[in-house]
Amino acid sequence: MLLRQLARTVAAAFAIALLASCSAIDSGTLDIAYEHADWLLQKMSTHYVELDKGQAEALRARLDRLHAWHRTQELPMYADLLDQAAERVARRLSKDDIDWMIHSFEERRRVGAAAVSKELAPLLLTLSASQQAQIAGAMTRDNARFAKTQLEPDAAALSKERTKWLAGQVERWTGKLTPGQFERVRRVAPATADFPAERLEQRRRWQAALLRNVRQYRDEPALGAALTELLESPRSVADDGYIRAVARLEDELTQMILDLDRTLTTEQRAAVVTHLHTYSRRLRELAARSA
């Protein structure tokens, strides 16, 4: 949907999904993805709601401002974080290192959320009741697709797919995993089997809260404040089950990373460090270009 996707993708599209997917694309594709991030976000919005001409022009202008801000202010910070992460990986990771990485990137996400709220609150105030209904319908369809792909397969098939995906993410940084390393990755999925269902329920709660805010607050400061809180602290609408599931997932992934770190070959560790420095350099080059 327009609201959720724009909120989430300042850190994702504008930062090129750092540490999640940027290593899966070459530097040329990285440049194209970033240079056209605002256009891509605007195109994505049409999946969720049909904007009138004035709204579409306003959205484009606001995305242009977000893009320019992110390029000059945020990309250098992401580059610094990647270089610091490379240094920590090179000397072997500790739990404190992983906690630092999580905290650092969460802080950048919160900053991005605040910027999104500032730009989008005025536009959200212009959405008609029918446009809000379009967004609600898109939410329902997206959730149905999520349930079909993430919940409907049998437990064994779902666990296998989650393992395949997670191993692929790791191998994008390390290169081919050894059988023992793959087995360590495989243990994460069954230990966090409840997460997809909890995630779907959290999506629904978050979406309902977002639409409720858009309908309830009809002045820019009030809507902006509510939107900022929701984007900066999405767990504010979470229930205990989701909070426990997220904590368990974070613990499992943290321990997986620590266990893998102890088994990395010299070549694998060098590959991770090289990838981190490479993407840091590309982000600095992008930041140096005129907006």
Language model regions located:
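Extended amphipathic alpha-helical interaction segments
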Residues: 118-238
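C-terminal motif of bacterial Sec signal peptides marking the signal peptidase cleavage site
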Residues: 18-21
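A cross-kingdom marker for long, charged
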Residues: 28-33, 38, 42, 200-291
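Bacterial N-terminal signal peptides that target proteins for export
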Residues: 1-11
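Bacterial signal peptide processing site
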Residues: 23-26
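Post-signal-peptide N-terminal segment of Sec-exported extracytoplasmic proteins
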Residues: 37-72
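Extended, structured, electrostatic nucleic-acid-contact surfaces
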Residues: 28-48, 109, 113-121, 153-174, ...
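Short, structured motif recognition centered on aromatic/hydrophobic residues
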Residues: 41, 45, 58-59, 116-127, ...
